[in-house]
C-alpha cells in the first residue's frame, strides 16, 4: 500500500488549495503555504495590503511571493503520472463543483468556491437571469453582425466585380500594346522596304551613268595615250621621217576633244528617316547645361548656361587645367558613366559647328586630331558637308536647324539626328566606352545666333525647345 499512498501524497502536495488543480507557476507566501501565482493574485485582488493567506489566514503587510521551482517540477511530475480527468459540463474546472452563478465583471461561470474566493467583490447573478440579459445583448449583436455580414458580402461582390473589370482592362491594354507594336513593326518594315527600294532605284539611276562616264573616260585616256606615244616617237625621227604624213598627225591632234563626265550630285535623295524615332529617343532626354570652367576664352556663355557663341574678342579667364585652349570647345556639366542619354542642340543657321562627346581625361591644351583614339567622338559640320575622323558621310540637302544626339553607354552607340524631321545624320561604329564621358559643344564659326541646348517645355514634357 506504500506506493498508492506515495502517489496520493504526491497529488495532494502538487495541488493548489485555491484552484484544486496541479500547481501552475507555484509561489510561496511568507507563512510557507504555496499557491498558483495567478490564483493568489486573483485571491488577494486589492493592490494594497494587508494580505491574508487563504489557507492559514496569517496576515502580511507586503505582497511577498517567492517562486517555488522544486514544487513546479513536482506538479509537472504529478501531472504526468495522474493527468487530470476531463471536467464534466456544468462543473468548475478549478474546484470540481457545480457552476451555479455568473460573474458580470469577468463574464465567467462560477461555482460556490469561486464566488466566495476571488469573485467575492464582483457582480454575481443567477445563471438564468444572466442568460436572459446576455441573450438580449447577443440578439442586438446578431442584428449588427448580420448587417455587417450583408455589407461584407456586398463589398466582396463589388471587389470581385472590380477585380474582373481590372483583369479585363489589363487584358484589353495588353492587346492594345501588342497590336500597336505589331502595327509599328509592320509600318517600320514597310518603311524600311520603301527606303531600300528608293535607294536601289537611285543606285540603278545614277550608278550606270557614273560607270558609263568612267568607261568613256577610260576609252579617251587610251586613245590619248596612244596619240601621245605616237607623237613622242615621231619627235625622235630624223627630219624626213618626222615630216612624212605630218598633216594627218596634226589633224588628229586638233580633233582631240576631251569630253568631261556628266555632273552627278553627290547628295543622296534617299535619307534614313525612321518614323517616330526622335519621339522615342526623347524618353531618354536629360537636362544638360554648360560648364563655364571648361569654356575656351573665345566662347561666350549665357547666364542660364544653355547657350554658347563665339565672342568678338578673347576673354581674360583663369587658365585652369579644365579649360579648352586653343580649341573652341565647352563641355556639359553632366558626367556620363552608364545608361542611355539624349539631348538636342539648336544650331540655327551656323555655318560650322561640332557636337558629340569626349572623355573626361582628354588633353585640352594642345591642338590635335579630335578622334576616337584621342577620346573624342564628334560630328563636324563645315557649311556644305559633314565629316568625322572615323569616316566621311554625305550631307543632307538641307542642313538641320536642330541636332539630336543619342548615347547608349553600355551598347557603345552614338548617333546624330536631325531633330526636325528625324533623319539620321551620322552614326559612329560600335565603340566600347569606358570611363567618364562629357557632352561637347563647339561653335566653329561666329554667328549672331548662339548654339543652344534645348530644354523641356511645359510639365507634360514631350516637347523640347531652345528656351
UniProtKB/Swiss-Prot annotation:
It catalyses: S-ubiquitinyl-[E2 ubiquitin-conjugating enzyme]-L-cysteine + [acceptor protein]-L-lysine = [E2 ubiquitin-conjugating enzyme]-L-cysteine + N(6)-ubiquitinyl-[acceptor protein]-L-lysine. Residues 304-325 are annotated as: Disordered. Residues 267-460 form the B30.2/SPRY domain. CDD domains: RING-HC_TRIM7-like_C-IV (cd16594), SPRY_PRY_TRIM11 (cd15811). Residues 127-207 form a coiled coil. GO terms for biological process: host-mediated suppression of symbiont invasion; innate immune response; negative regulation of AIM2 inflammasome complex assembly; negative regulation of DNA-templated transcription; negative regulation of neurogenesis; negative regulation of viral transcription; positive regulation of viral entry into host cell; protein autoubiquitination. A zinc finger (RING-type) spans 16-57. It is found in: Cytoplasm; Nucleus. GO terms for cellular component: cytoplasm; cytosol; nucleoplasm; nucleus. A zinc finger (B box-type) spans 87-127. Signal peptide: none annotated. The modification Phosphoserine is found at residue 85. It holds the Pfam family PRY. The keyword Methyltransferase does not apply. SMART domains: BBOX (SM00336), PRY (SM00589), RING (SM00184), SPRY (SM00449). Zn(2+) binds at residues 92, 95, 114, 119. Binds cytoplasmic tail of integrin alpha-1. Interacts with the HN peptide. Interacts with PHOX2B. Interacts (when autoubiquitinated) with SQSTM1/p62; promoting AIM2 recruitment to autophagosomes. Interacts with AIM2; promoting its autophagy-dependent degradation. The coiled-coil domain and the B30.2 domain are both necessary for interaction with HN and PAX6. They are also involved in MED15-binding. The B30.2 domain may be involved cellular protein quality control by promoting the degradation of insoluble ubiquitinated proteins. PANTHER family: E3 UBIQUITIN-PROTEIN LIGASE TRIM. Belongs to the TRIM/RBCC family. This is E3 ubiquitin-protein ligase TRIM11. It comes from Rattus norvegicus (Rat).
